[in-house]
Amino acid sequence: MKLTREKWENNFSEWFDWVIREAEIYDYGRYPVKGMGVWLPYGFKIRQAAVDLIRKLLDAKGHEEVLFPLLVPEDLLRREGEHIKGFESEVFWVTKGGEENLDIRLALRPTSETAITYMETYWVQSYKQLPKKYYQIVSVFRYETKATRPMIRLREVSTFKEAHTLHETYEDAERQVKEAIEIYKNFFEELGIPYIMSQRPEWDKFAGAIYTIAFDTIMPDSRVLQIGTVHHLGQHFTKAFDLKVQRKDGTLDYPHQTSYGISDRVIAVAVSINGDDHGTILSPVLAPIKAVIIPIPAKDEKETEKIIEYSEDVAKILVSNGINTVIDKDTEKTPGEKYYIWEIKGVPLRIEIGPRELSSNSVFIKRRDTLQGISVKKENLVSEVVKLLETLRKDLKERAWNFLRSKIRYTDNLEEAKKMLDSKAGIVEVPWCESNECGLKIEETTGARVLGKPYDSPRDVSKSTCVVCKKPAKTTLRLAKTY
Amino acid sequence: MKLTREKWENNFSEWFDWVIREAEIYDYGRYPVKGMGVWLPYGFKIRQAAVDLIRKLLDAKGHEEVLFPLLVPEDLLRREGEHIKGFESEVFWVTKGGEENLDIRLALRPTSETAITYMETYWVQSYKQLPKKYYQIVSVFRYETKATRPMIRLREVSTFKEAHTLHETYEDAERQVKEAIEIYKNFFEELGIPYIMSQRPEWDKFAGAIYTIAFDTIMPDSRVLQIGTVHHLGQHFTKAFDLKVQRKDGTLDYPHQTSYGISDRVIAVAVSINGDDHGTILSPVLAPIKAVIIPIPAKDEKETEKIIEYSEDVAKILVSNGINTVIDKDTEKTPGEKYYIWEIKGVPLRIEIGPRELSSNSVFIKRRDTLQGISVKKENLVSEVVKLLETLRKDLKERAWNFLRSKIRYTDNLEEAKKMLDSKAGIVEVPWCESNECGLKIEETTGARVLGKPYDSPRDVSKSTCVVCKKPAKTTLRLAKTY
């Protein structure tokens, strides 16, 4: 069977809504508050696998998990000027408790720099306690005025992993930015999510940051989605909160901070990037169910019973080897109907067991990504399944990376850049002198969003000139249609 | 050394504040919103162990984890009349997004019956889908007017495990109530938390329930703390939300529900119940660190280095056997200062390693609960540590249960009941005719809180009469000073 990616690529938005609904990942559009949805059991397990992975990676680098209150008093949130400017139009405010008006408005946390810096004034006095690396996994809230989208642009971002670190020096915070980038790279590598890293332009960095490094990916419809950010905050918040620590030389000074976050969007990408017109394809790293067994009924009822027994035996072997496997025993559905739904759900392997498999003591295994099948003897079951899962994981990852790479273009002509972007180019790079003025001009002319300059793999622009001012280019500027 | 429980028992409130602060479990009273605190890294790990355990127990019984939005629109929350009456004075309301007034007020979830029942109208159509067992672990919010207390009475309850189930019949929901009770019993048994189960009186059941079974425990100060509740909701919410399903016989009817919850209070109890004047004592089931190694410096610096090396070797052996162990290498603190802080933190075992241990290839292990020590040869290290942890776990549990049992009294004299309660009796049972009128009279006369009638171990009251009306008693009524 030919696995097409027509709907996936050309009607992605519709495809995505269909998959998260039919695969029972995330219920969106029915809960009666705009921009808020429900993680369904299957989706919750995918989410949990991602959460477990990021915890493991952060803990291994000495991060400590904490849990702060949801509510931030207005005066705290207003303490750092740039920060509140960036967020104030998007804050949900609690103003009442019962029928009493509260003395001070309480914000649903849009992010936690202010709350955490405030508490650090109690916790940290000396450089000897530094660096400190905290993180929490919580909901954050934004009163988005843009069109909301399930898992991608929400008013309640229900899986926000935010890390907040504190350092004696600017340089140590910069080292932390690099550590955070390595952690996120490992995270995305493990999940098979391709990414590109850019330093956001001055006019699009995090409100309160010195600079922001962002991870972006390209969705099936060629639009770019930001999936992770790392900020060097310098002393902006420590000064605003008058947080001073004793330095090694005995003087008191404001320590330096970083913060970095990832969200639900990681799951949205994991579900999207490996998809086709049959549904999603989950990397085995995230898949709650690694293999689904579909018993193929025989004409003879007793034989069917034996097939079920045999299927249970196969499932037991796999489960006891740590490979979560379910049998779809529904007697009201045909095997074909079962294939349909489990393909939408993206279970990596399907194991078909019918009379032929029963009599030959074998199973027939189909990979979700290719739908190619092989017959496997029962005695080789575990080793073959492990091998297939690993091959599938690698193949998915390679395909996803190839897709991303195929969507990055270069031109030194601004008109052409605009045309490329209008015809789903993905990301277009143009040579740039690095001035804000030219950057803003490029953004305006192309009607695209500026992602910033390359952080990872800069192009050689030594012979190029800025597309606007024609002065020698210092780097490239990345442009895209974004979410 | 004699381990006293003076402060623990007689100044419990102060003891508790001291422990959670000094052990770095929960930062309370400094975050600038009343009734909200911060889970610190050490406390977060204790919390996580409890969360992992309840997840394991619920999943094993077919519960599915989901995640609902925080915000509940006012009209949804008002749908079930009794429910909103019980909660409305305690709801935090979001009324603004940015500077815009919202069309409808949004409640910070006080609990999720309404949100979940609403979504179930989309999800469930047929008895074939039943029973459904959902749960989520989230923050819930109550605008408490009573005095707030860390982890015990909060405005943000940041670890609320709420389960919500749906059933074809009243009887199946009743079966679920029993299943939930078994799950909670297993949970508390495993954590070594003693409990007593009561059916709450009519006037103190959950707002919207047919009946409520509660788990209570007795704190060191003899006051009773509710630590878990299980509610039979009948058709109250399904009727309010017009949720009908097709029954086996083809008719449409409102299904029956249960809900059950536990909270942060479980951690508060785990920290409190096994304590003494040196701090908390954590059951190995919850302890993030099972053993702490304190190297005792030698006079000779080289020997001290060898002691450190030897300590690292010991730690490595334990960690590789799944026993999380840390070495306190701080050179600015004396061993005595280290004992002090690790005792507050309640690490189950302390391993002292000095010149004597180094030369004899042994370690000296002290149990936190008794501070009794034994010398153990290195070759027996793992088996001895495992044995000690298990003995300590059992001993803690037994002591805690003995404490609870010693605090349950019986009298058929109301005056005496009042006296007992005023002199820290814990729980007092009196014979009761089971009428609301007499129950309320008992509550009024004693000035105590009525916990309800025994669910677990009812007394034989066949020869007794109600303390108020003198008619034959049907059961006992439990009274207590409560949190």
UniProtKB/Swiss-Prot annotation, chains A, B:
InterPro entries: aa-tRNA-synt_IIb, aa-tRNA-synth_II, aa-tRNA-synth_II/BPL/LPL, Anticodon-bd, Anticodon-bd_dom_sf, Pro-tRNA-ligase_IIa, Pro-tRNA-ligase_IIa_arc-type, Pro-tRNA_ligase_II_C. Its EC number is 6.1.1.15. GO terms for cellular component: aminoacyl-tRNA synthetase multienzyme complex; cytoplasm. It catalyses: tRNA(Pro) + L-proline + ATP = L-prolyl-tRNA(Pro) + AMP + diphosphate. GO terms for molecular function: ATP binding; proline-tRNA ligase activity. Gene3D superfamilies: Anticodon-binding domain (3.40.50.800), Bira Bifunctional Protein, Domain 2 (3.30.930.10), C-terminal domain of ProRS (3.30.110.30). It holds the Pfam family HGTP_anticodon. It is an enzyme of class 6 (ligase). Belongs to the class-II aminoacyl-tRNA synthetase family. ProS type 3 subfamily. NCBIfam families: proS_fam_I (TIGR00408). Catalyzes the attachment of proline to tRNA(Pro) in a two-step reaction: proline is first activated by ATP to form Pro-AMP and then transferred to the acceptor end of tRNA(Pro). This is Proline--tRNA ligase. It comes from Sulfolobus acidocaldarius (strain ATCC 33909 / DSM 639 / JCM 8929 / NBRC 15157 / NCIMB 11770). The lineage of its organism: Archaea, Thermoproteota, Thermoprotei, Sulfolobales, Sulfolobaceae.
